[in-house]
Amino acid sequence: MSGSKPDILWAPHHVDRFVVCDSELSLYHIESAASPSSELKAGSLRLSEETTATLLAINSDTPYMKCVAWYPKYDPECLLAVGQANGRVVLTSLGQDHNSKCKDLIGKEFVPKHARQCNTLAWNPQDSNWLAAGLDKHRADFSVLIWDISSKYTPEVAVPAEKVRLAPGDSETCSVVTKPLYELGQNDACLSLCWLPRDQKLLLAGMHRNLAIFDLRNTNQKMFVNTKAVQGVTVDPHFHDRVASFFEGQVAIWDLRKFEKPVLTLTEQPKPLTKVAWCPTRTGLLATLTRDSNIIRLYDMQHTPTPIGDETEPTIIERSVQPCDNYIASFAWHPTSQNRMVVVTPNRSMSDFTVFERISLAWSPTTSLMWACSRQLYECTEEGKGSSSLDRDIATKMRLRALSRYGLDTEQVWRNHLLAGNDDPQLKSLWYTLHFMKQYAEDIDQKSSGNKGLLVYAGIKAITKSSMGTTESFRHSWTGSDRQADIVHYSSEERCLALQLCGWRTKGADSDMGPFLNSLEQEGEWERAAAIALFNRDIRRAIQILNKGASTGKGNLNLNVVAMALSGYTDEKKSLWREMCSTLRLQLNNPYLCVMFAFLTSEPGVYDGVLYENSMAVRDRVAFSCLFLNDAQLSRYFDKLTNEMKEAGNLEGILLTGLTKDGVDLIESYVDRTGDVQTASYCMLQGSPSDVLKDERVQYWIESYRNLLDAWRFWHKRAEFDIHRSKLDPSSKPLAQVFVSCNFCGKSISYSCSSVPHQGRGFSQYGVSGSPTKSKFTSCPGCRKPLPRCALCLINMGNPVSSSPGASKSDEKVDLSKEKKVAKFNNWFTWCHNCRHGGHAGHMLSWFKDHSECPVSACSCKCMQLDTTGNLVPAENVQP
C-alpha cells in the first residue's frame, strides 16, 4: 500500500460502497449511470458505461498504512482497523457516526511489545470483538496477536519511545491497549491469516515457512504443514474446508480435512502474484493477479464425482479477463452481484467489470437441449416442430423404433418395416428382401444337402452370375390379345429364384402372377400391377386392372384413357399408334404408366426406357431385366445398377448385393447419409456370413447402436439386442463377466452345474432353475464347505427363495426343443463389494426399499448408495 499500491475493500453490509486504501482512506458510493453519454456529477468518476462512483469521505489521519480490515458487523458501519508500519493497529472511521459505541472505539490503538511491521489483519466473523494481527518476526515476541477491541485501555503503562515514533499527535491522549487476548507464533513471521468459518476459535496463519492452524482453546498445540505458499491465505466462502495460498507465481489449494499436502497446485505464473480471492457469489471460482499485469486469471474448479478412495485432481477451467488497459494494482469481488468486481490501477483509476459466464450447452440423448448461463438454466424447445415422422431427427426415429421392438421380429421379417412406421419405401423394400431371402434360403437348405442357401444371401447379382451359360431363351405370344407377335424372354433356375426374391413369383413351380397382382390391387397400386401384368405378356389383365382402378372411389380417371390406349396396341413399327405413344408417354406423371408404353414401343432387346426409369422400384427393374435381358446384357446392367445403389446408399440395392462386402459398402453409404446405425446393425445380423460380420465397419455400427441404447437408458432393449445378436451370430456371445468362487478352496461354484445336464449358463448357475429339489447346491462342489447364508433369511445360498408352485416330476425332464431358462432373479447371489455381505437378490431389494444400511448387525455400510447406477431408472417406458 504505502501510497504506491492502492487496494480496494467492499463494505460488508453496504453493497454500494467501497473504500480505496493507499496513503489515505477514500470512501466511494457506486450508483447506476443515467446513460453512457450523460454528464457526470461533480466529484463523480465513471467506472463503466452503466456505473459511476461518488467520493463520500476521506480519512488521512492514519499514515504508514500497511493493511486495512473492515469491521464485519453492521454497527458501527464504517469502522476500520488499520495496521501500520510500526505494528500498531488503529481503529478509525469514515464519515460521521454518532453511535456512542463507535465513539469509544475510534482512535483506539493496540500496541505490541516490540515495534515491527503489521502485515495482515482479520476480524473474527462470529465474535466481532476479536481482531487478529500478523506481524513481522521478533526474536523475543510473538507474531500473531489477537486483540479484544472491547478491552479497557491501560494509560498507566509506559509506552517506549520506539513504539510511538510514528504515531501522530499526542500519544498521551490515545486509548492504548498493550495486552493482547492471545499471543501465538513465537519467533516467526506472520505474512497472512484468516479465521476459519467452521469454528470461531480456529485461526489459519501463513507463517514464515509453514501454514499453521491455531486452536485458541489450546494455544500450546497447533496443526501445521511445511510449505512456501504462505501468502494470501483465504477460505472459500462456499466450501469452508478449501483454502488458497500462494508463493511467488504459484497458487496452492488446500483441503483442511487432509492438510498434509495441497490437493491442487495451479500453473505457475511467470510473474509474482500479488493477490488471490475467492468469488463470494460463485462456487469454486478463484481470481489471481500478478505484478505489472492488466490480466486477471480465473480458475473455475469443477465438482466432478470421483470413486471412493480415488485421489484424482479436480477438473479446472482456466481463463483470463482484461478489465482495463492499464496495469492493475488490486481488485475486489462485489459481495452480492454475481461475478462482478472493481479494479484499481496504481494511479487510482477504477473500473467496474463483470465477468461473463461461459455458456454451456448440453444436448441429451433424447434431443432435449439445456442452456446454462450464470445461475440460470434454460430448456430450449424447437419452434414449429414438424409433426410428420419424416421431419424427425434420425436419433428420434431410432428411439421410437427401439420402443416398438423394431428389427427383433425374426419370424415374419417383413413386419419390421411396419414397426419402423411404414413410412419409408427403402426400409419396406429392405425388409421384404430380407424376408424373401430367409424364406427361400430355408427352402433350399431343406431340399439340398449343401449350403446353397447361403447363395440366396449373396444377392441376385451373385445368383444370376452362377447361371451363366445355362440360360434358355423362349418366344411367347401375348395373352389376351389378337396380335400374335412373339416376345423373347429368358429363363433359368437361378433367374426364377431371382424373380421370387423380387416378389414376382411365389414358392413352387407354379408361375401364376395372380396372387401377387391381387395383393398390389388391394394396396391400391393399380399402375404397378398393370405394368407387371403387361411385362408378363398379359395385356388383357393389365387393361382390366386399369379399368378397375379407374372405377374405384379414389381412382384416377386417366387410367381409363391409358387402358383405351393399350387396347389399340399394334406391333407395326411405323404405325401412328406407336408414334403417338412414344411422344406422349413422357407427359405421364406415373412412372409405371410411362414404362408400359416404353416397353410396348421398344425394339426387341432394347429396353432402356424401362431399365433406367429411376422412379420405378429397383426390384421391379431387376425382375424385368431377369425376364428380357440375355446373360451379357444382364451382367452389364447389374454391375451398373449396383454401383449406382452403392454410391447413393439406396437400401433397395441390397436385393442385388446381398449381405456381402458389396452390401457393406452400400450400407456404409446409407449410414453416412442418414446416420441410421440401427437398421444397419439389424440388417447385417440377419444373414451375413462370419467374414462379413467381422468387418470393422459392421462391428462399429453394432457397438454404436449398443452405446446409443445405453445412452437412452434402454438397458432392457440393449439386452434384447445382445440376445438377438448372439442367436444370429453365435461367435459374438460374450464370456461370463461374473462368477462365484468358494472362499475356502477358491474353486468356482459353477462346477457344480456340470453334473446336471442341460443346466442354463450365465447367472442361472448361481441361482435356482428347474426343480427346487434337483437344483439345490448349498455347498461347494470342491471342498464341501457350506455356501454363505443369506443375511436376511439365514438360509444357505443355493436354496430357492420359495418353492415354485405346481412343480412336479415332469419338471425334471429336460426339453431340448425349448430355450434354456435363466434362473429367476430373486434367487441370484448378491453381495456388496464394500462390506462383503449379501444374500438372495429378492431379499436384498426388499430390504433396501425401506432401509439404507446393511441388514447385518453392527454393519453400518450403506450398500445401495455405493452403487451410483442403482439410482438410475430405465427410460424404456418413457415416451419422448
From Swiss-Prot:
Q: Kindly list the places in or outside the cell where this protein is found, as annotated in its UniProt entry.
A: Lysosome membrane
Specify which residues bind Zn(2+) 2 according to the UniProt entry for this protein.
793, 840, 843
In the UniProt record, does the keyword Membrane occur? yes
Query: Can the keyword Lipoprotein be found in this entry's annotation?
Result: no
WD repeats span 60-102, 113-157, 185-224, 226-264, 268-309, 399-441
Binding-site positions, Zn(2+) 1: 742, 745, 780, 783
Q: Which Pfam families match?
A: MIOS_a-sol, MIOS_WD40, zinc_ribbon_16
Domain of life of the source? Eukaryota
Molecular function GO labels? zinc ion binding
Keywords of the record: Lysosome, Membrane, Metal-binding, Repeat, WD repeat, Zinc, Zinc-finger
The stretches annotated as zinc fingers (C4-type) lie at 740-786
Q: Which GO terms describe its cellular component?
A: cytoplasm; GATOR2 complex; lysosomal membrane
The UniProt entry lists the main location of this chain as membrane
List this protein's GO terms for biological process: cellular response to amino acid starvation; cellular response to nutrient levels; positive regulation of TORC1 signaling
Q: How does it assemble?
A: Component of the GATOR2 subcomplex, composed of MIOS, SEC13, SEH1L, WDR24 and WDR59. The GATOR2 complex interacts with CASTOR1 and CASTOR2; the interaction is negatively regulated by arginine. The GATOR2 complex interacts with SESN1, SESN2 and SESN3; the interaction is negatively regulated by amino acids. Interacts with SAR1; the interaction is direct, disrupted by leucine and mediates the interaction of SAR1 with the GATOR2 complex to negatively regulate the TORC1 signaling upon leucine deprivation.
Name the protein family: Belongs to the WD repeat mio family.
Designated name of the protein: GATOR2 complex protein MIOS-A
Report the source organism.
Xenopus laevis
Upper lineage ranks?
Eukaryota, Metazoa, Chordata, Craniata, Vertebrata
